Amino acid sequence: MGDVEKGKKIFVQKCAQCHTVEKGGKHKTGPNLNGLIGRKTGQAEGFSYTEANKNKGITWGEETLMEYLENPKKYIPGTKMIFAGIKKKAERADLIAYLKDATSK
């Protein structure tokens, strides 16, 4: 799908201020993303999610992340994620490739 190394750079620039990916990583403003792929929304243990996030009821995967990362507030109205989104599909694909790799270790 995307390029893991390019995705890592995007994560560092746009996501790492609020999220960690490593197993056992701490929650920041946003939840630790380890184990993200295949998990339902609002399920990272120990993180305080909005009801909107908990009630969305989708499972994170390539397709759901592709849509969410384009415009988080449109995909989950009421989310507390303040990130505006990534408009370029190729950049989202790179980020998702990195997340698939980094959050599964």
Swiss-Prot record:
Protein modification: Binds 1 heme c group covalently per subunit.
Annotated positions of the N-acetylglycine modification: G2
Annotated localization: Mitochondrion intermembrane space
Stored Pfam families: Cytochrom_C
Binding of heme c, residues: C15, C18, H19, M81
A single Gene Ontology CC term: mitochondrial intermembrane space
Recorded superkingdom: Eukaryota
Principal subcellular localization: mitochondrion
Gene Ontology MF terms in the entry: electron transfer activity; heme binding; metal ion binding
Alphabetical UniProt keywords: Acetylation, Electron transport, Heme, Iron, Metal-binding, Mitochondrion, Respiratory chain, Transport
InterPro entries according to UniProt: Cyt_c-like_dom, Cyt_c-like_dom_sf, Cyt_c_1A/1B
Role, per record: Electron carrier protein. The oxidized form of the cytochrome c heme group can accept an electron from the heme group of the cytochrome c1 subunit of cytochrome reductase. Cytochrome c then transfers this electron to the cytochrome oxidase complex, the final protein carrier in the mitochondrial electron-transport chain.
PANTHER family recorded: CYTOCHROME C
Family the entry assigns: Belongs to the cytochrome c family.
Protein name: Cytochrome c
